[in-house]
Amino acid sequence: MFDAKIKTLALITMSLLAPYSYAQERPTHRIVGGSAVQAPSWMVAIGNHVDNKWDNYCGGTLIDKDWVLTAAHCVEGSRLSGMQAAIGVTDLSKRHPRSVVDQIIMHETYRNNFVQNLGSNVEDIESDIALLHLRTPSTNGVLAISDRDSTSDYQKGRSEFTAWGYGGIDPDATLSSPQLLSVNLTFQGFKDLWTFTPTQTHIFAGGVVGKDTCQGDSGGPLTDQHGLVGVTSYGGNRCATGQAGGYTFAPMFRDWIAEKMNSVSITNHQLVSLPAGQHTWVSYTVLNTSPDSVTLEGFNTDAPALLNECPNSLAPGAKCNLKVRFDANFTPDTYKLYKLSINALKPNGSSQRLDASLVAITTKKPDTGSSIGGGSSSGSGSHSSSESSSSSSSGGGSLGLFSLLLLPLAWRRKL
């Protein structure tokens, strides 16, 4: 059995704020100094449907009819319920269709570091990449990941990229744009320009005053004529000040992406907050995109209860749900870290362990006289039962669920 961890909200807040106390120049991305453009078919805006309103907070890239590639830090404070993707949309303020996201796969290295560092002042942005699965395949054209994966393929100050996003348009990220923008940036090497150490997971671009990505552009694409080169990851607190931004180097993760797109997966991380005295069920999708049926066994969690809606054998292309109960009965402004694991047995006798985490936060009871329904609610969410079409708030969207807690992530380019 797992040992659930209980920590104060102050500690988790400190763990997310602290990295910027010693690296004040290290945060988010939005397009500054760019131009309005027609959205390519593969451009994605990611957001959540909350209180009858959809707010986008990150970008992404459609790399397959079923899959969107984005940054891991875009989903570390998210819940699967209500997550949607607007694909190929030029202006988010206008009515547009959106696709329901039914699976979140955060890179294991990033997830493990994030969970391990909760409540501390340690941050690790290695492998800042994640995959989102679409419930309904997109008919839009996709963007292939560049096959240029060697440092010798790029020339500092000469190789040119294009960054895309709906995020902030001024250095302090106080203004944002519902219109898709792009900006041209030049390659600045593989050395982390913040810690001055070589990195294998990031590429750096920009370095020109007045041109940069910024908050709200996180997860969005960095491209060249060969395809997708980077995923917007981090940059300076103030954008476009002449410091190059960090982009997760997509070609390095080609094998990881291919593996996850063709195997068994579980929604491997969610964050949910709930007023004291309430409870909910948080749904985790188990998705089989492998060519074979798998046997599911060894269900284990340290959460108060587990509702298993999965069959013993999960067929190729099938999915099912596991629901973890979250009782907000601990001290307000504290959280528990719950873990969930299952084993997937393959026809050849090998076993694949699937691990997931839940950061469950108890908040204070609302001051208003109205009550909030406790009941149970599945992770599928009331807005994820069908494809939706509506306009959103302008720009990178609102801070959304618990994003005040996760504000430093906005500096990393998430709104």
Model-derived features with residue positions:
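Surface-exposed binding patches on compact interaction domains or structured appendages
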Residues: 289-321
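Catalytic-histidine neighborhood of serine endopeptidases
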Residues: 51-53, 64-65, 69-113, 153-158
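Chymotrypsin/trypsin-fold serine protease catalytic domain
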Residues: 91, 99, 125-209, 250-251
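C-terminal subregion of chymotrypsin/trypsin-like serine protease catalytic domains
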Residues: 36, 57, 61-76, 177-192, ...
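Conserved catalytic-core segment of clan PA serine endopeptidases
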Residues: 25-39, 84-139
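Protease-domain processing segments flanking chymotrypsin-fold serine proteases, especially trypsin-like
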Residues: 2-15, 20-69, 78, 84-87, ...
